[in-house]
Amino acid sequence: CIRDRACIANGMALHGGVIPACGTFFVFSDYMKPAVRLAALMHLHVIYIWTHDSFRVGEDGPTHQPVEHEAQIRLMEHLKNHRGERSMLVLRPADGEETVTAWKLAIEEHRPVALILSRQNIKNLPALNHSRREEAAQLSKGAYIVVDAAKPAVVMLASGSEVATLVEGAELLSKEGIAVRIVSVPSEGLFRDQPKSYQQTVLPQGVVRYGLTSGLPVTLLGLVGENGMIHGLDHFGYSAPYKVLDEKFGYNGQTVYEEVKKLIGK
């Protein structure tokens, strides 16, 4: 069963000689929690691959659609182990290139790592100044700028497949001359470990922030703050094709466009 796989992975890590990896649908990570907690406590290098990361599972319905799970597992990044380090690394990459870097980080780590991946296909994000792969390597900083403007009126944040939705919204906003910055935040823990100067460069003070998450809004609260706006889910999902649910729940460029305009008073 799922619970046993996580326990076996801990045993393999303790034995040594291998880097164990185990996975399941993200919603079923609940079964793994006791073993995951022990891996974090014992500094075990185990990789958890959790897929089907949102309501976009579709017709399987709310029993298979994680909502609160990302907020729960990201708490482990705030919990320190006995070495004084963040006890776990949680990564939710936004596209294939970020996933390459995330896997590289996971292999090179010495503590447990969670990779939270989508079910649906996701196109690579646009390149800003260099090749997309070079830019995606900045995932190692926990958060980085994907789309930018000289004087952004708003900073928009997301992780995973929601970053692409922000890009769609930014295209609509740009048509009205509204300058935006988009930040991909695969790991708040890694981002908080960066120098304050880097954090302030990515998220400048005095610029309003908008967050988009397919989980609980609190998932992004520490980054967006009380004065910004977070579009998230505060309820269970439904059984329907994921594109239908995207529209029902407002996960599209048009909604981002409308909410950001309201947020900045345009």
Language-model regions, residue ranges each:
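Generic detector of short, aliphatic-rich beta-strand segments that form the cores of beta-sheets
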Residues: C1-I2, V256
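TRNA-recognition modules of translation machinery and tRNA-sensing kinases, especially anticodon-binding
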Residues: A94
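Thiamine diphosphate
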Residues: R3-E77, L79-E85, L89, E98-T101, L157, V167, ...
